[in-house]
């Protein structure tokens, strides 16, 4: 098992290297000169050129890439033009907000989505099944920002149940933390609940059509045991794989949600950096999110091999 884990981690290293190179090259394609941004309006050409030399922007792209990868190897993501602090520090300060939002949304998505999918499979072609499929369609057709704005107007402005913006750290007030995140987390989860329910329903229906399920029913096994012990247990392996993909989507979806609810997380940091053309922050945040997605996929892959030992021999 240890060898398998090491193999999966080793396979992720070149992927991370490719992510790093693509992130660097993408930033080079963006308009604007960081030296002019740092120098400010009205700076002389000599000042701008001096800053370009200090930043190494006068070097060929290949040299800049090599230097950036070397700094990255030493956990140096550069320094923010806008915040006047190391990019790694800016990310570390805002990471707990994004992780809290994604984990809370994940905690809502998984049980609700799985239960809805199982019930929809059991009540196939019923009104509940139709409702679940409609929710899945809603998740891919309705923009998240539109639904988030409606939720703020209804639950925050009109009813006053939840705060419309802001974040309370968990250590300061667990209840305040929950109140500040429950609404954005619910909106974020809503789009994934339908997807997970549809996936669970599909896997359950496929398993329930197998011969061993018919055999169990013919032997008089209760329907509850058939669903929980036989059908769901076998369908859960595929659902586990999807859960990692869902968590990655929740991290990515937090960019819009954090902006609407004024949550000081990585998503809002990225948007502010893009608007201010703070390239080191944009570069560092995108790279960190890319590495995070790769790490999540590796973790899910390892859990998948634990849940289904047959994969180890493929």
UniProtKB/Swiss-Prot annotation:
GO molecular function, one term: dipeptide transmembrane transporter activity
Record carries keyword Electron transport: no
Keyword Transmembrane helix: yes
InterPro entries registered for this protein in UniProt: BPD_transp_1_N, MetI-like, MetI-like_sf
Domain ABC transmembrane type-1: 95-304
Keyword line: Cell inner membrane, Cell membrane, Membrane, Transmembrane, Transmembrane helix, Transport
Membrane-topology annotation of the record: Multi-pass membrane protein
Subunit structure: The complex is composed of two ATP-binding proteins (BAB2_1052 and BAB2_1053), two transmembrane proteins (BAB2_1050 and BAB2_1051) and a solute-binding protein (BAB2_1049).
Full protein name: Putative peptide transport system permease protein BAB2_1050
Native species: Brucella abortus (strain 2308)
């Amino acid at each position: 098992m240890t060898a398998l884990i090491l193999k999966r981690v080793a396979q992720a290293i070149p992927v991370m290297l490719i992510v790093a190179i693509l992130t660097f090259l993408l930033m080079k394609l963006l308009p604007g000169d960081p030296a002019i941004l740092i120098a400010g309006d009205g700076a002389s050409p000599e000042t701008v050129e001096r800053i370009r030399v200090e930043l190494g922007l006068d070097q060929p792209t290949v040299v800049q890439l090599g230097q950036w990868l070397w700094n990255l190897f030493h956990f140096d993501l550069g320094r923010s033009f806008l915040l006047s602090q190391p990019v790694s520090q800016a990310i570390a300060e805002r990471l707990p907000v994004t992780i809290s939002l994604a984990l809370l949304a994940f905690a809502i998505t998984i049980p609700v989505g799985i239960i809805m999918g199982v019930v929809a499979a059991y009540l196939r072609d019923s009104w509940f099944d139709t409702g679940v499929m409609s929710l899945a369609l809603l998740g891919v057709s309705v923009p998240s920002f539109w639904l988030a704005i409606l939720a703020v107007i209804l639950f925050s402005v009109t009813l006053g149940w939840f705060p419309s913006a802001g974040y309370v750290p968990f250590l300061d007030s667990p209840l305040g933390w929950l109140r500040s995140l429950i609404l954005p987390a619910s909106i974020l989860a809503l789009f994934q609940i339908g997807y997970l329910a549809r996936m669970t329903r599909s896997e359950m229906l496929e398993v329930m059509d197998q011969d061993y399920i018919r055999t169990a029913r013919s032997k008089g096994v209760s329907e509850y045991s058939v669903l929980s012990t036989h059908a769901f247990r076998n369908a859960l392996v595929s659902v586990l794989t999807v859960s990692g993909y869902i968590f990655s989507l929740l991290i990515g979806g937090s960019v819009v949600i954090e902006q609407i609810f004024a949550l000081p997380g990585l998503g809002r940091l990225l948007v502010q950096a893009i608007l201010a053309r703070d390239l080191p922050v944009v570069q560092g945040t995108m790279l960190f999110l890319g590495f995070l997605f790769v790490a999540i996929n590796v973790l899910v892959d390892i859990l998948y091999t634990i849940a289904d030992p047959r994969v180890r021999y493929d």
